[in-house]
Amino acid sequence: MPNFLPINTILVPQGAEYKAVCRAFRGVTGSIPTVVAIPVGMKPLLKYLHASPANAQFLAPKSRVLIMGICGSLSDRYKIGDLVLYQDCVYQGKQQECDRTFTAQLHSSVSQKVSLVKALTSDHLIWSAAEKRRLGETLAADVVDMEGFTALEFFNAAGVDVAILRVVSDDCQHNIPDLTPAINDGSLNPLPLAIGMLRQPLAATRLIRGSLTALKVLEQVTNLLFSG
């Protein structure tokens, strides 16, 4: 692990994203950060952060938290599999910035192509390509997620250095399935998820392919950062 950017904790949305990051550490020797699975969505994440038994570790002096995962593109510039590093995150007119020094160090550590972006955090799943393009244009945002702003607001208030590194899993040219009914209290419920996928098979196929591509890149970049 590069000693000049000691990362204490990696937070990753639970499920496939968390598993991809954990796979990246197989065979990695030396000091590795604690990888923590977090709930999906703003409200479940905020509740988790305030109640988590790992709070003492998150908020320790000089601790650094890296948030990883996948995201959706709001711009034609960012394609499936692209690696993005957040500069800041917006939500309903409010803005939270990532730590500039930490972000710059990560940027120089990732030898493969990585783009510095402005992110939007949404309190609901944005499945429509038209809505993605509209949000990208009106808010001048590049990508969208469902956790970034909440995490930044929490850790910035506590004085913890935070950076966010994500991989694009869906573009702004095609709809993805509306899986809103499947998201419940921070997790994906299998039955509504399956029903949502079956109702929109073409969109589901695109989402699965995009997610698999993004998860592979997520695993690769995690291994790259921490394998020395």
What are these regions (language model features)?
Residues 168-228:
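Regulatory input/activation interfaces that engage signals or partners
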Residues 24, 82-84, 131, 194-198:
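Short, basic/glycine-rich phosphate-binding loops at helix/coil junctions
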Residues 48-55, 105-113, 125-126, 158-164, ...:
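Noncatalytic linker/hinge segments flanking ATPase motor cores
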Residues 22, 50, 107, 149-152, ...:
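Predominant activation on well-ordered alpha-helical scaffold segments within soluble catalytic domains
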Residues 1-111, 119, 142, 157:
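Metabolite-binding pocket within alpha/beta catalytic cores that recognizes anionic/polar moieties
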Residues 16, 40, 44, 97, ...:
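Conserved active-site and cofactor/substrate-binding residues in soluble primary-metabolism enzymes
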Residues 100-173, 177-181:
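Active-site rim beta-loop-alpha module in soluble metabolic enzymes
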Residues 72, 81, 87, 123-124, ...:
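Flexible, active-site-adjacent loop/turn segments at secondary-structure boundaries
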